[in-house]
């Protein structure tokens, strides 16, 4: 084991699928001697503990109730000396070694353009008069597809309330991180920690969906 990289996986296991096994297996197959932390999110069935490879995997039985966000912070605060962190959901299967992306401070493989409104809109794929088209779409089109807003007004209010715990603010547009799933350097997480971003902890699925947006906001400010 070395402190080059740490894989952090949030897991809620109820026995209905093999996601956590497939996820950890894919990491072990693509990386030499990886260090994997599985943070249990208060799973009703903990029998999976016995079926994970103890050579590479450490399970944190911490009864995490704050979804992926809580799992990420629990693992980072316990293991804060690694160079690179892979923050993953147990539904992810890695198909190849991604260490080439470790040269970046932050990597997200799926992201989406967001706005500080409910709903979204579809933009014609052209560079011609793009700024004017963007302005017109915001002004005239309440329903969108290519740019994603929030699902509910309550999510916006919760997000704005949580951001008050930090120096970050709600912009009009930004890139959100799907999942949120990402690879980042140690100093990226430390900066979030210094700015109290670890104080934003979702307690339900709707709030966790907001974290895709909030992580994106924090990373871009």
Where are the regions that the model predicts?
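ER/Golgi luminal nucleotide-sugar-dependent glycosyltransferases, focusing on the catalytic module
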Residues: 1-221
């Amino acid at each position: 084991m070395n402190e080059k990289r740490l894989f952090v996986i949030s897991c809620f296991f109820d026995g209905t699928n093999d996601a956590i096994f497939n996820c950890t297996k894919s990491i072990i197959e693509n990386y030499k001697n990886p260090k994997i932390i599985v943070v249990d999110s208060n799973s009703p069935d903990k029998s999976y503990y016995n079926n994970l490879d103890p050579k590479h995997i450490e399970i944190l039985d911490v009864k995490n109730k704050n979804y992926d966000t809580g799992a990420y912070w629990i693992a980072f605060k316990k293991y804060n000396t690694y160079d690179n962190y892979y923050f993953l959901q147990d539904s992810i299967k890695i198909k190849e070694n991604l260490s080439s992306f470790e040269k970046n401070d932050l990597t997200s493989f799926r992201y989406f353009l967001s706005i500080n409104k409910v709903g979204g809109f579809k933009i014609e794929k052209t560079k011609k008069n793009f700024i004017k088209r963007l302005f017109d779409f915001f002004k005239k089109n309440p329903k969108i597809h290519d740019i994603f807003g929030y699902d509910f007004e309550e999510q916006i209010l919760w997000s704005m309330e949580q951001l008050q715990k930090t120096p970050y603010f709600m912009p009009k547009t930004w890139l959100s991180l799907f999942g949120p799933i990402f690879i980042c350097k140690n100093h990226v997480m430390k900066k979030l920690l210094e700015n109290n971003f670890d104080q934003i902890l979702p307690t339900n699925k709707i709030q966790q969906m907001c974290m895709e947006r909030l992580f994106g906001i924090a990373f871009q400010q």
